[in-house]
Amino acid sequence: MTPAQATAELLAVNEQLRTAIDALPIIANTYDRKRAQTFKDLIAAGESTTSAREWATTHCLDESFDQARAKALVESLRERQALLVFLLEHDLLS
């Protein structure tokens, strides 16, 4: 894999990660967030994109198969993202 290929893949992984996080169902544990069912609900309630994504990924439901699968997808994409960033930062690609 060349650095250009890794960079292109990292951009694709970042987009997939954003899409996966946007779709995560969440549990609201504060008064302001109790009405939020999805990431997009948090944004509509005035949360910043960054804080809403972070909050949604740490509070997603994992009781059902679909929700657990969505959480696993996010975790997998984050691992791939971290690997690509590491390889690029340390110039380990040919």
Model-predicted regions and their roles:
Residues 15, 36-40, 44, 61, ...:
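Generic surface-pattern signal
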Residues 21-24, 28, 65-94:
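Long amphipathic alpha-helical coiled-coil segments
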Residues 44-73:
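Short, glycine/alanine-rich amphipathic alpha-helical segment
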